[in-house]
A protein has these predicted regions:
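C-terminal hydrophobic helical "lid"/dimerization subdomain
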Residues: 1-5, 273, 277-281, 321-372
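Mid-domain Rossmann-like dinucleotide-binding core that forms the NAD(H)/NADP(H) cofactor-binding site
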Residues: 97, 147, 155-240
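Short N-terminal strand-loop motif that marks the start
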Residues: 1-82, 140-144, 369-372
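Glycine-rich beta-strand-centered segment in the early N-terminal region that forms part
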Residues: 37-53, 66-115, 135, 153-156
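Residue-level marker of beta-strand positions
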Residues: 80, 98-99, 113, 141, ...
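Glycine-rich cofactor phosphate-binding loops and adjacent beta1-alpha1 units
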Residues: 180-181, 194, 208, 224-312, ...
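Residues in the short beta-alpha loop(s) of Rossmann-like NAD(P)-binding domains
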Residues: 219, 295, 319
Length: 372
């Protein structure tokens, strides 16, 4: 296997411009094609030749919204990565040649948080495109720790690049389902069911045996698709106030034969304030609200309602690497269908891909494939 002298990459050389007086971002970040040295690989580290990297909402937050990355620009974004191991440091030689999914969150596995089994929120975690130094997925290669890589033994005729979406879009909902203690027969509500994570949240919930699964979003065309991808019912929230949405939700619950205010597992997948407010407003007795999407806004909520309802609000960050093989199995067995929900484009189209992803008009997740 050929080992390059340089890594070809699309760096975010500058973050978005923030106007303090106006209190808002006035210009997006800047991307530049460049090359960076291949680092000397340490013990347990490998170099992965990237097959594909998904364009995620998190990347948009860094590039357009001013959410800070742990490593300051210049750095390369991108954390949904699949590829082939082409080189290794000491002790990781057996990984060479393996086709892998790179976890979006790679924990240290030695700290107190990791000892508690919450490795996905390790404070020393390495996340490509954020806290893995300058390295990210919109590149030809990436150096990563080997210990938590997910091996793909058989591609089953699917392009290796397509498996990139497992590294966040498909695994994040699985982690959220575990955090919610989701079980067969649980009623589920998903806000943002048409988004890059929401479409997989519905499929994961269905695989867990949840019923009914109700999805909310604002795009009618995408909502129709959601009915073929795990949802039993959908609600278009566009131009509706909370009371109208609540009445529609209650009618659906009645039709499905379940109580509208008892035991719902709610997955908020947008990170948008309006959707978060809906999710909070519909949280009822012994229910659980799992916060999956990230946003910078604040919400107003009477936390005494949690006491009165004996309800829970839970955060869910990324996914434990140990769950990746299970999600891979769900994809390969057909329980999670990824192929209709993605499209591959050459990485040279990254600037246009970012614009389209930021616009919110995409119907498929873009996976960029290196063409340096």
């Amino acid at each position: 296997m050929s080992i390059p002298d340089k890594i070809q990459t699309w760096q975010m050389v500058k973050g978005p411009t923030y106007d303090k007086e106006a209190g808002k971002v006035t210009a997006p970040g800047e991307l530049q094609k460049t090359e960076i040295p291949v680092p000397e690989l340490g013990a347990g580290e490998v170099l992965v030749e990237i097959a594909g990297c998904g364009v995620c909402h998190t990347d948009m937050s860094y590039f357009y919204d001013g959410v800070p990355t742990q490593t300051k620009p210049p750095l390369t974004l991108g954390h949904e990565i699949s590829g082939t191991v082409v080189a290794s440091g000491p002790g990781a030689e057996s990984w060479i040649g393996k086709k892998v999914i790179v976890p979006a969150v790679m924990p240290c596995n030695t700290c107190g948080i990791c000892d508690e089994g919450r490795n996905n929120r390790c404070l020393a975690q390495k996340m490509p495109g954020n806290s893995l130094g300058i390295y990210g997925g919109f590149s030809s290669h990436i150096p990563v720790p080997a210990q938590d890589l997910c091996v793909i033994e058989d591609l089953q005729g699917r392009p290796l690049a397509n498996y990139a979406v497992i590294a966040d879009a498909a695994t994040t909902p699985y982690q959220a389902a575990i955090r919610a203690e989701l079980k067969e027969g649980d009623p589920v509500l998903i806000t943002g069911i048409t988004g890059g994570v929401g479409v997989y949240m519905a499929q994961v919930a269905k695989a867990f045996g949840a019923k009914p699964i109700v999805g909310m979003a604002r795009n009618e065309e995408k909502l129709k698709r959601a009915l073929t991808m795990g949802a039993d019912y959908v609600i278009n929230t566009k131009d509706k106030d909370f009371k109208a949405i609540q009445e529609e939700f209650r009618a659906i619950a009645k039709q499905a034969g379940v109580k509208h205010n008892v035991g719902w597992k709610i997955f908020e997948c947008t990170g948008v304030g309006a959707a978060q407010d809906i999710a909070l407003g519909l949280l009822g007795f012994i229910g659980k609200l799992v916060v999956v999407g990230f946003g910078m806004q604040k919400n107003s909520y009477s936390i005494s309602r949690l006491m009165a309802f004996d309800a829970d609000i839970i955060g869910s960050w990324g996914c434990l690497p140990c769950y990746y093989p299970k999600v891979l199995e769900m994809v390969q067995s057909g329980k999670i269908d990824i192929d209709p929900l993605l499209e591959t484009r050459p990485m040279s189209q990254i600037q246009q891909a970012f614009k389209e992803a930021h616009s919110g008009g995409l119907t498929k997740r873009i996976v960029l494939t290196p063409d340096f």
